[in-house]
């Protein structure tokens, strides 16, 4: 899909060592510009998730991603939004497989890498269709791509970093992916002026919308269990950029000190027979 020379040229702009990841990165960058260059899509969806954090708020991304996570910002039929996004992506990515489930629509675009060894690749574009709100207000950030293969820029609708991290904290509790811990720790270290209390407030407000409450002890116990799980801790290393390392214990300590201790309730009491980390 992308001429090899253009993939090689993009290498100087990315921190990835793997040719397939470099190609994927360029595909994601173009897809973002394409989506937010469509007038309807630019008004109706906002960009969030780990890819948003690394692409919009970090000088250089810390980890690789193959997904674009979007949120439908206004209540209404999702059909026109789906049509608008496909109008920008299908002409160069082909016809996607797609799935609609409760609260989300997901497109899967599949292709093969140009560089050898030929690798099956995909771009997943997911739209959350029920969270039509923002805690801290939306932000517009100009995102640009300058490649011989594609040049363009778009005004991307997204969230304040504290709100992105509030939803990332929710993801850390709800799913078993070490990348959520990595993203939180990296943001706490890299983003000066980040308001920790606002991150926690956003986390709590999203939980309120879900009709849930999570105490400090519940969260700490949940994370302690995950840190003993090899699936959780092995999730990150294959995704890391050149020169970036991940120490789960240090990341845990950072997130604990900066965020979890600010949650409501008493701290979790670790059982005497449970080995301590670090």
What annotation goes with each model-predicted range?
Residues 47-52:
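Glycine-rich beta-strand-to-loop/alpha-helix junction loops that act as flexible
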Residues 1-45, 56-64, 68, 72-278:
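Structured mid-to-C-terminal alpha-helical surface segments
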């Amino acid at each position: 899909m992308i001429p090899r020379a253009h993939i090689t040229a993009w290498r100087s702009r990315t921190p990835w060592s793997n040719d397939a990841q470099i190609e994927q990165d360029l595909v994601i960058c173009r897809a973002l510009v394409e989506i937010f260059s469509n007038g309807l899509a630019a008004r109706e969806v906002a960009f969030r998730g780990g890819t948003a954090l690394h692409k919009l708020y970090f000088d250089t991304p810390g980890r690789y991603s193959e997904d674009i996570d979007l949120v439908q910002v206004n209540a209404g039929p999702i059909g026109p939004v789906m049509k608008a996004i496909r109008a920008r992506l299908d002409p160069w990515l082909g016809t996607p497989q797609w799935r609609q489930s409760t609260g989300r629509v997901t497109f899967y675009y599949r292709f093969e890498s140009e560089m050898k060894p030929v690798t099956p690749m995909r771009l997943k574009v997911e739209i959350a269709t029920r969270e039509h709100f923002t805690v801290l207000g939306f932000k517009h950030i100009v995102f640009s791509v300058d490649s011989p293969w594609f040049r363009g820029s778009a005004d991307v609708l997204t969230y304040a970093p504290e709100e992105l991290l509030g939803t990332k904290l929710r993801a850390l509790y709800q799913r078993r992916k070490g990348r959520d811990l990595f993203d939180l720790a990296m943001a706490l270290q890299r983003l000066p002026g980040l308001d920790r209390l606002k991150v926690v407030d956003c986390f709590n407000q999203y939980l309120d919308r879900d009709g849930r409450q999570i105490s400090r002890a519940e969260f700490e116990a949940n994370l302690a269990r995950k840190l003993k799980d090899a699936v959780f801790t092995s999730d990150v290393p294959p995704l890391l950029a050149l020169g970036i390392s991940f120490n789960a214990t240090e990341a845990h300590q950072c997130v604990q000190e900066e965020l979890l201790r600010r949650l409501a309730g008493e701290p979790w009491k670790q059982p005497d027979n449970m080995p301590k980390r670090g």
